[in-house]
Amino acid sequence: MKIVVPIMPRNLEEVEAIDVERLAEADIVEWRADYLLKDDILRVAPAIFEKCSGKEVVFTIRTTREGGHLDLDDQEYVNVIKEVATLYQPDYIDFEYYSYKSVFEQMLEFPNLVLSYHNFEETPSNYMEIMSELTSLSPAVVKMAVMAKTEQDVLDVMNYTRGFKSLNTEQIFATIAMGELGKLTRIAGVITGSCWTFASLDETSAPGQMSLSNTRKFLEILEN
């Protein structure tokens, strides 16, 4: 599994304070731009991409529709993403497919999409249908993060991931059952076929997220 570490600066000073040496163990850096005001994203972007030079970067605006911090209408959302993507060519671009379906066609020019679905309330009964639709679009990555309320939720996420990966071997999946119960899904990629996991430096970006150092230790034990 590749470890993705989110960074969530709220201003330029916090960008400049990021210790790049602490990111050394990360395989990919996710810039969570929703911690900034919309009009500050392009101002801060040059410093972010300079800091992350040499690392793969996922550009993410997690909106309030899926548990994030920025409230953007459909066109605002796609416009900011396209501006950053065009100017700075991040390795991956997160797109909240179900929340912004009406503007998805405007993103088809980008082959590096992470089509994501987030549900902080539950593991929905139509999980398989959601995963099937996202997979059918053949993005760079299918990402699904749902809240685990029961042990069965955790097992379901792992089983569904294993099934979809076995049928779509070339597709990259990143599946997470959030919360304390779901921690196992964050390190079980060797079994399930989930290819990415998310870990924190300091502040977590989702419930149940483990530290970068602990995640690396667990993966080394399980994968070697």
From Swiss-Prot:
Binding site for 3-dehydroquinate: 30-32, 62, 186, 205, 209
UniProt GO MF annotations: 3-dehydroquinate dehydratase activity
Pathway the protein acts in: Metabolic intermediate biosynthesis; chorismate biosynthesis; chorismate from D-erythrose 4-phosphate and phosphoenolpyruvate: step 3/7
Classification via CDD domains: DHQase_I
InterPro entries (alphabetical): Aldolase_TIM, DHquinase_I, Type-I_3-dehydroquinase
Catalysed conversion reaction: 3-dehydroquinate = 3-dehydroshikimate + H2O
One record GO biological process: chorismate biosynthetic process
Active-site feature positions: 118, 143
Annotated keywords: Amino-acid biosynthesis, Aromatic amino acid biosynthesis, Lyase, Schiff base
Pfam family membership, one: DHquinase_I
Quaternary organization: Homodimer.
HAMAP family: AroD (MF_00214)
Family of this protein: Belongs to the type-I 3-dehydroquinase family.
Role summary: Involved in the third step of the chorismate pathway, which leads to the biosynthesis of aromatic amino acids. Catalyzes the cis-dehydration of 3-dehydroquinate (DHQ) and introduces the first double bond of the aromatic ring to yield 3-dehydroshikimate.
Name of the protein in question: 3-dehydroquinate dehydratase
